């Protein structure tokens, strides 16, 4: 029940007195012991017989009913929820000094962390029935802070489950609603080239569509990942994979059927089609969880960056001149080299390979992380055999900071066994060492046997130095990974038969320099048997700030055996804030002394800052000449759109993109920004146009729905609407809802809205007198709940009112202290959307 106390207009001091009295009466229980109704005796127009007992004491007469309250359990804040409160018994009043006590069921107490099994009376109680928890659990108590609408619960520690920090009870995990969904990302470009030093001229068109579609049915998630590419009239459609998955909560695991990839902690990850059961560490609280690649590079001009893995294009974006960073990849497997192509505006390309494998993490004592996979190897776009195989990976935390791990791969023509040991050495860092023995049957029935040795080290120092990964791996000439051996069997002339991996080293170091900024250093090297060359790359940079001016210096060096010379690029960037606009300067130079400079502005626009724009103008040496670009990126409630134009001496290009999602569910079809893995559908009937907090551009649509994307699975997330964005005929009982989605879930965040008119009504009795101050008025409507309190001179402000209806008015328990108002609202409104009305209470 919602009580609304609002001043009703500019009145005399007589009205001010009564309004002040009402506010004191409504708030007094939070601060004082009693409220004396004699305070109102000298206020003209107040019926001295009105029943104001509900305001007389903070220990007494708040009305029983349902209230939306914040919940605090043993000083830990939990999610807000609607709870029923009952009038306290005399024994409860004496014990806790409370007028209202919460009506809590066994299930609700368990959600709060109470150890139900320790109390037979709780264990035997019906799941949804109110229980006398304060009698059953010694020293248990509750306090309802009515003014703050907060329920404070206190239980002895022995009565509580021993849970890790950050634990969200499994009973709150929400599998979501049944729905169909599509997450799409489309990009295109149209270019025309007219080389200044030749007679060559041509047009080039390129399009790319990334689709992640699926269906949720209960706990099951059906997903398909497909891409479409069109380059200069040549179409390619790739069905990358289809899978059916669900959470296995008792095992803290994820079951997947169909296309997936094996774990990459011990062996190199490969794509497969079959069945997999793997630990899901997202189900663990943050305090018990113990590497996604970041790609850095430098673009000399407005460039297109493409990332491929396993011969699939998994990412494409357009970047401006200078150093760039890509940190939001979704690789198709947990390891596998990433091929990065930077296509400059003049058509030239830079290419480098970034080795990628996930870090073998140490496990907490007693924690088992595992993965079981069985099925058929998938070669992706490569022409290779697809043998059946099984793989097991396991890591277990031992005492004293040790972790033991191992695994096995079995196939008709291949087997591999691995074992290793990791140790957390505290100040020294974390180290792991493992060895893998493999035997392969290659082409022409040739057998090959060998070993691979791996060393990993990671450490963060108090000085701000962070070794995220320092690793070395060496393989003997007879060692083949499962993927290498399979490809060699498929093609005796494969490069793997002569050139397979020999050693690999990679390191990532970041050093924080406090007020002086930070530096980073990334290096990788990879070489192959029977090949003298080495594949190497180095990235280094410095980020700093002087006053409000940000600047950075970056250097990249890449070398591949098939290249005659290495690629070297040096860049400098500087940004100066000018309100909501930034002035930017970029400079890049390569090993041949060719220099490119760009000067421009960028910023955001619109109320939610959801329109990004940039304008750049540049000049290149060595005859490159002038260049420039204009880019817009809009993030709307139903999707995102981008548009860009750039030119140089050899031509011009227009690029554009659309990103978003569509969800079909029981309450409509809702368009969205890109969806991510887990998401929430807001349901707020009648609240069209309401803005979602912390989600720029997202608004409730005409059906009362909106999508909040990119929720973290198994983590509590608060979804909130901006009250000031509601129209004049909508009120919310609460402006925020907490949700806890499981992996891939589409959860419902339901807001209770009161849709109707805001009314300022002058109420008189049949005898012509005003309805007494302090009387309660309740809407008689089975579909709506709206109540308020009558002010001085019979003035009533109430929201959520229909055009026609009836109000029940009470100011006491006698029949003479009750009446009913039948009303039909007039059309006139003031400038705040409030309807003015007069009515007789009979």
Curated annotation (Swiss-Prot):
Matches recorded under PROSITE patterns: FIMBRIAL_USHER
Gene3D superfamilies in the record: 2.60.40.2070, 2.60.40.3110, 3.10.20.410, Outer membrane usher protein FimD, plug domain
Swiss-Prot/TrEMBL keywords: Cell outer membrane, Disulfide bond, Fimbrium biogenesis, Membrane, Signal, Transmembrane, Transmembrane beta strand, Transport
Single GO BP term: pilus assembly
Membrane topology: Multi-pass membrane protein
Signal peptide from the UniProt entry: 1-21
Keyword Lipid metabolism: no
GO molecular function, one term: fimbrial usher porin activity
Cell compartment(s), UniProt: Cell outer membrane
A GO CC annotation given for this chain: cell outer membrane
InterPro entries, alphabetized: Fimb_usher (IPR000015), Fimbrial_membr_usher_CS (IPR018030), FimD_plug_dom (IPR042186), PapC-like_C (IPR025949), PapC-like_C_sf (IPR043142), PapC_N (IPR025885), PapC_N_sf (IPR037224)
Entry function: Involved in the export and assembly of LpfA fimbrial subunits across the outer membrane.
Family: Belongs to the fimbrial export usher family.
NCBIfam families the UniProt entry points to: PRK15207.1 (NF011754)
UniProt protein name: Outer membrane usher protein LpfC
Source organism of this protein record: Salmonella typhimurium (strain LT2 / SGSC1412 / ATCC 700720)
């Amino acid at each position: 029940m919602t009580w609304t106390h609002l001043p009703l207009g500019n009145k005399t001091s007589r009205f001010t007195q009564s309004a002040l009295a009402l506010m004191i009466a409504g708030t007094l229980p939070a601060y004082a012991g009693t409220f004396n109704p004699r305070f109102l005796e000298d206020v003209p127009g107040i019926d001295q017989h009105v029943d104001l007992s509900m305001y007389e004491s903070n220990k007494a007469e708040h009305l029983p009913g349902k209230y939306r309250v914040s919940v605090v359990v043993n000083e830990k804040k939990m999610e807000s929820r609607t709870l029923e409160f009952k009038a306290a018994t005399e024994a409860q009043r004496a014990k806790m000094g409370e007028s209202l006590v919460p009506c809590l069921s066994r299930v609700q107490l368990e959600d709060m962390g109470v150890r139900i099994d320790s109390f037979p009376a709780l264990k035997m109680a019906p799941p949804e029935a109110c229980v006398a928890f304060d009698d059953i659990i010694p020293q248990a108590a509750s306090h309802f802070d009515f003014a703050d609408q907060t329920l404070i619960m206190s239980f002895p520690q022995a009565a509580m489950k021993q849970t890790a920090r950050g634990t969200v009870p499994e009973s709150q995990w929400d599998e979501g609603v049944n729905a169909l969904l599509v997450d799409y990302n489309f990009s295109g470009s149209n270019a025309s080239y007219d080389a200044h030093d030749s007679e060559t001229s041509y047009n080039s068109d390129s399009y790319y569509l990334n689709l992640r579609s699926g269906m949720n049915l209960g706990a099951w998630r059906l997903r398909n990942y497909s891409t479409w590419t069109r380059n200069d009239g040549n179409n390619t459609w790739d069905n990358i994979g289809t899978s059916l998955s669900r959470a296995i909560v008792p095992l803290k695991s994820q079951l997947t059927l169909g296309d997936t990839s094996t774990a990459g902690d011990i062996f190199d990850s490969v794509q497969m089609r079959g069945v997999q059961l793997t630990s899901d560490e997202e189900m663990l609280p943050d305090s018990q969880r113990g590497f996604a690649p970041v790609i850095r590079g430098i673009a000399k001009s407005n460039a297109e960056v493409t990332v491929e893995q396993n011969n699939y294009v998994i990412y494409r974006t357009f970047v401006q001149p200078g150093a760039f960073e890509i940190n939001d990849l979704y690789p198709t497997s947990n390891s596998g080299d990433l091929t990065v192509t930077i296509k400059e505006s003049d058509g030239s390309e830079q290419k480098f390979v970034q080795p990628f494998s996930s870090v073998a993490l140490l496990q907490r004592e007693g924690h088992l992380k595992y993965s079981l996979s069985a099925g058929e190897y998938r070669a992706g776009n490569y022409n290779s055999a697809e043998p059946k195989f099984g793989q097991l990976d396991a890591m277990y935390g031992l005492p004293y900071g040790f972790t033991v791990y191992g695994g096995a791969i079995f196939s008709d023509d291949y087997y591999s066994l691995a074992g290793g040991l990791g140790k957390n050495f505290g100040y020294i860092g974390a180290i792991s060492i493992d060895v893998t023995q493999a035997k392969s049957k290659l082409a022409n029935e040739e057998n090959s046997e060998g070993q691979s040795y791996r060393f990993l080290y990671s450490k963060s120092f108090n000085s701000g130095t962070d070794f995220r990964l320092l690793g070395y791996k060496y393989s003997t000439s007879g060692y083949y990974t499962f993927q290498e051996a399979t490809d060699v069997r498929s093609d005796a002339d494969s490069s793997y038969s002569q050139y397979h991996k020999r050693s690999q080293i990679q390191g990532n170091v970041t050093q924080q320099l406090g007020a002086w900024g930070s530096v980073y250093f990334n290096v990788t090297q990879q070489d192959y048997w029977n090949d003298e060359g080495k594949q190497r790359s180095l990235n280094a940079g410095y980020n700093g700030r002087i006053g409000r001016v940000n600047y950075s210096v970056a250097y990249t060096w890449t070398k591949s055996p098939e290249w005659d010379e290495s690629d070297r690029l040096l860049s400098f960037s500087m940004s100066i804030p000018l309100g909501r606009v930034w002035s930017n300067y970029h400079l890049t130079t390569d090993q041949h002394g060719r220099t490119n400079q760009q000067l421009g502005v960028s910023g955001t626009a619109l109320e939610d800052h959801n329109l990004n724009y940039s304008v750049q103008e540049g000049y290149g040496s060595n005859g490159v000449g002038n260049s420039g670009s204009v880019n817009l990126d809009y993030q709307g409630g139903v999707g995102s759109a981008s548009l860009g134009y750039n030119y140089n001496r050899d031509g011009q290009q227009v690029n554009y993109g659309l990103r978003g999602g569509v969800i079909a569910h029981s309450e409509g079809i809702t368009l969205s920004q890109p969806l991510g893995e887990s998401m929430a559908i807001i349901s707020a009937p009648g609240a069209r146009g309401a803005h979602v907090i912390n989600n720029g551009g997202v608004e409730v649509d005409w059906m009362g729905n909106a999508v909040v994307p990119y929720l973290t699975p198994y983590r509590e997330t608060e979804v909130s609407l901006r009250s000031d964005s509601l129209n004049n005929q909508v009120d919310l009982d609460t402006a925020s809802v907490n949700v806890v989605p499981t992996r891939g879930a589409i959860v419902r965040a339901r807001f209770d809205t009161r849709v109707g008119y805001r009314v300022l009504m002058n109420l008189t009795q049949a005898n012509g007198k005003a309805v007494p101050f302090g009387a309660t008025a309740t809407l008689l409507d089975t579909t709506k709940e709206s109540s308020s309190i009558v002010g001085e001179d019979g003035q009533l402000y109430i929201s959520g009112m229909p055009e026609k209806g009836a109000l029940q008015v009470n100011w006491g328990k006698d029949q003479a202290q009750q009446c009913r108002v039948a009303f039909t609202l007039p059309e006139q409104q003031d400038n705040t959307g409030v309807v003015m009305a007069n009515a007789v209470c009979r």
